[in-house]
């Protein structure tokens, strides 16, 4: 699952507009996957098990059909990569935990603009969510 932020330019109703600079604007180059990740997605996007999902909140579960897709397929463990460790990855991990999914976070494949928040989140995944951080 490629859960990608989807925002509208200057959306005054979205809470992130007041918190962060414009990012992942629908139709913009900034919303594209980067480098080899984009290559892998383009090569595999037509496969049945590859799913692009727009998300408008921090958690990939919020306002999406992610839980339904996972449960339909009998998936019980989610593997998380991406940015930001202490924002979107964190909120997705918390929702996954609350919905009963096992969690694996790849520490070399998550990042944040806040190093302290990044390190805190990695520990939180282990100590509060029982996640594996590999």
Residue ranges and their predicted role:
Residues 1-5:
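Short beta-strand segments at enzyme active-site cores
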Residues 10, 14-134:
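Active-site-adjacent betaalpha module
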């Amino acid at each position: 699952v490629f859960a990608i932020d989807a925002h509208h330019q200057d959306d005054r109703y979205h809470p992130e507009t007041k918190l962060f600079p414009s990012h992942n604007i629908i139709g913009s180059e900034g919303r594209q996957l980067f480098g080899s990740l984009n290559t892998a997605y383009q090569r595999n996007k037509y496969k049945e098990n590859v799913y692009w999902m727009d998300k408008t909140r921090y958690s990939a579960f919020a306002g999406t059909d992610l839980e339904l897709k996972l449960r339909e397929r009998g998936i019980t463990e989610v593997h998380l990569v991406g940015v930001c460790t202490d924002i979107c990855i964190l909120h997705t991990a918390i929702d996954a935990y609350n919905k009963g999914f096992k969690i694996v976070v790849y520490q070399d494949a998550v990042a944040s603009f806040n190093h302290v928040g990044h390190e805190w989140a990695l520990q939180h995944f282990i100590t509060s969510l029982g996640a594996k951080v590999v």
